[in-house]
Curated annotation (Swiss-Prot):
GO molecular function: ATP binding; ATP hydrolysis activity; ATP-dependent DNA damage sensor activity; mismatched DNA binding
Record organism: Xanthomonas axonopodis pv. citri (strain 306)
NCBIfam families: mutl, PRK00095.1-2
Cited PROSITE patterns: DNA_MISMATCH_REPAIR_1
Domain of life: Bacteria
Name of protein: DNA mismatch repair protein MutL
InterPro entries given in the database record: DNA_mismatch_repair_CS, DNA_mismatch_repair_MutL, DNA_mismatch_S5_2-like, HATPase_C_sf, MutL/Mlh/PMS, MutL/Mlh/Pms-like, MutL_C, MutL_C_dimsub
GO BP of this protein: mismatch repair
Keyword terms: DNA damage, DNA repair
Family: Belongs to the DNA mismatch repair MutL/HexB family.
Main function: This protein is involved in the repair of mismatches in DNA. It is required for dam-dependent methyl-directed DNA mismatch repair. May act as a 'molecular matchmaker', a protein that promotes the formation of a stable complex between two or more DNA-binding proteins in an ATP-dependent manner without itself being part of a final effector complex.
Gene Ontology cellular-component terms listed: mismatch repair complex
Lineage of origin: Bacteria, Pseudomonadati, Pseudomonadota, Gammaproteobacteria, Lysobacterales
Annotated PANTHER family: DNA MISMATCH REPAIR PROTEIN MLH, PMS, MUTL, DNA MISMATCH REPAIR PROTEIN MLH1
Length: 625
């Protein structure tokens, strides 16, 4: 068969197969062009889910009449002119493929007017066949009209979904855009009826967050803002108990571009690994900013993917930033107050963790609560270390700290003496700690406490389990991982890539407790394994570690296996249900929760406490109505 040059129309239709997957792809490309043109308002009109009509109108810079034919030519763009421009591209579009690809599979009209022009101009294209440029009345800016998408490619059109499904894909992409560009007003109509409007506001505003993802997400979101190594990560991460069954609320932006990137997604998953319930997905809106020269956006025509030049560094930066942010969420803290001033999380002061006598979990000293942000409250600043459940030792200290002397009026009225219970006169006093003071125990399972806002309910086993778990981790982190030599070295058959990874990452593997030498092209000698995991399956564990190191540059398999073991130990050592606690014991547990990282969730990701405000309780009883 002879080799022949394909006609231009067929070339564009082939290119459209990569760029134009469905109506949402058309909306994405056209709106991104509008934003690159400096638009501050974009109107999107749709009919039949975008299959019959997509009309995008903007107030951007516009196009001159003589450039209209060039705008719909392949690889014609105003955004790059050289290889250097491509390697540092900062605009959303740059390939010059979108307009000709869309025009080749639709009935396409491009109308535009520069702000300094007297009138606009229009160009019509029918299935790739170019018309003439004609004058047309038009406001400053550009309108792109796409009718009958895939009318000339029936094989593509029959794979489109129902109208509601296609509209849903468009709305989801617009939500993603609205989060990244709150400074732009977006108006959407469908079948002649207004369906959505995003009002312009401040960059990365909480208002746009609530408008886009809902007030529940906004209330449970922690603001993150951290910089280092020429990188900046900012945005919001939802608290672990606001988890999802799917990944529908995971948004990542690299230099303002919405992307999917596996190493960052892996880093986020690792950061949540210790606090998320099994099978649940975290919710987040994260913006990663870095020098455009350090990221390659020219990976796929649809520009959904990027490639980092320092993927290992970025993975570690994202993981540590989010791990620290989630670690500093303690029970009783208000989500949006992390960081206090809204600029990001603040680390609590470091220190050891107090022991839990009743659970048999070892401890090594005391810990202090951070002095700034969410964890500073009026006058409640005790200087002693957080108390465990050694009630005999704690009772005198609690009585002195929290119990005011009873008044003569109380004594004469026969009121109980509060000095022996460790309770304050009222939880409305200034200086009440976040989880308040215990008032009762419910069915031997839950602690009921009163704080300044209302009622706190604590699952005592789950809370005690997390406290013990964090203390065990602190103790093991301080001594590091010990390697246990094998009496007889184990020979492990691996693939050549795995053997190369093991040889290259020998030092990293040594820090994880593995001593490994290469025995051949596809075999390894394992001379030592992590002592703590001696009873695990070292062969399967090592294969998983090598896979992580090859793909992500690091691995938490050993730490995860260790944490799973420590979690089991903490669970067995935690106070059990139906054990009756005294009020000082309950107060000691509340104080330890406030001083313990990640104490809002148990080791399995379940919440350890809940808050019911006084206004919530008033509504239950219809008070004030």
């Amino acid at each position: 068969m002879a080799i022949r040059q394909l006609p231009e129309i067929l070339i564009n239709q082939i290119a459209a197969g990569e760029v134009v997957e469905r109506p949402a792809s058309v909306v994405k490309e056209l709106v991104e062009n509008a934003l690159d043109a400096g638009a501050t308002r974009v109107d999107i009109e749709l009919e039949e889910g975008g299959v019959r009509l997509i009309r995008i109108r903007d107030n951007g810079g516009g196009i001159t009449p003589d450039e209209l034919p060039l705008a719909v030519s392949r690889h014609a763009t105003s955004k790059i002119a050289s290889l250097d421009d491509l390697e540092t591209v900062a605009t959303l579009g740059f390939r010059g493929e979108a307009l000709p690809s869309i025009a080749s599979v639709s009935r396409f009209t491009l109308t535009s007017r520069r702000h300094d022009a007297e009138h606009g101009s229009a160009l019509e294209i029918d299935g790739g066949r170019l018309g003439e440029v004609v004058p047309r009345a038009h406001a400053p800016g550009t309108t792109v009209e796409v009718r009958e998408l895939f009318f000339n490619v029936p094989a593509r059109r029959k794979f489109l979904r129902a109208e509601r499904t296609e509209l849903g894909h468009i709305e989801e992409w617009l939500r993603s855009l609205a989060l990244a560009r709150p400074d732009v007003e977006l108006r959407v109509s469908h079948n002649g009826k207004p369906s959505r409007r995003y009002k312009p506001g401040d960059l990365y505003s909480d208002a746009r967050l609530g408008e886009t993802l809902g007030d529940d997400f906004a209330r449970q979101a922690l603001r993150v803002d951290h910089s280092g190594a020429g990188l900046r990560l900012h945005g919001w991460v939802a608290q672990p108990h606001y988890s999802r069954a799917s990944t529908d609320q995971q948004y990542l932006y690299v230099n303002g571009r919405s992307v999917r990137e596996r190493s960052v997604a892996h880093a986020v998953k690792m950061a949540y690994g210790d606090v998320l319930f099994h099978g649940r997905q975290p919710a987040y809106v994260l913006f990663l900013e870095l020098d455009p020269a350090r990221v390659d956006v020219n990976v796929h025509p649809a520009k959904h993917e990027v490639r980092f030049r320092e993927a290992r560094l970025i993975h570690d930066f994202v993981y540590r930033t989010l791990q620290d942010a989630l670690a500093h969420t303690r029970a009783g803290a208000t989500p949006n107050s992390i960081g206090g001033d809204g600029t990001g999380y603040t680390a609590a002061t470091s220190g050891g963790m107090g022991g839990i006598a009743s659970g048999g979990v070892p401890g090594n000293g005391g810990a202090s609560i951070g002095s700034g942000g969410a964890y500073s409250y009026a006058s409640w600043t005790p200087s002693q270390t957080p108390l465990g459940l050694r009630v005999d030792e704690a009772r005198a200290a609690y009585s002195a700290l929290y119990a005011p002397p009873p008044s003569s009026a109380q004594q004469s009225a026969g009121m109980p003496n509060m000095a022996g219970t460790g309770l304050p006169a009222t939880a409305q006093d200034s200086g009440v700690p976040p989880l308040g003071y215990a008032i009762a125990q419910l069915h031997g399972i839950y602690i009921l406490a009163e704080n300044a806002e209302g009622l706190i309910v604590v699952d005592m086993h789950a809370a005690h389990e997390r406290i013990g778990y964090e203390r065990l981790k602190h103790a093991h982190d301080s001594i590091g991982l010990h390697a246990q030599p094998l009496l007889v070295p184990m020979t492990l058959a691996v693939g050549e890539r795995e053997a190369d990874t093991a040889e290259r990452e020998a030092e990293t593997l040594a820090t994880l407790g593995f001593e490994i030498t290469r025995a051949g092209p596809q075999s390894l000698h394992v001379r030592s394994i992590p002592a703590l995991l001696a009873n695990a399956e070292p062969e399967a564990l090592l294969r998983d570690v090598l896979s992580d190191l090859r793909e992500h540059g690091q691995s938490r398999r050993i730490a995860s296996a260790r944490d799973e073991l420590l979690s089991t130990m903490a669970c067995h050592g935690a106070v059990r249900a139906n054990r009756r606690l005294t009020v000082p014991e309950m107060n000691a547990l509340l104080r330890d929760m406030e001083a313990t990282e990640r104490s809002g969730q148990c080791n399995h990701g379940r919440p350890t406490w809940a808050r019911f405000t006084l206004s919530d309780i008033d509504r239950w009883f219809l008070r004030g109505r």
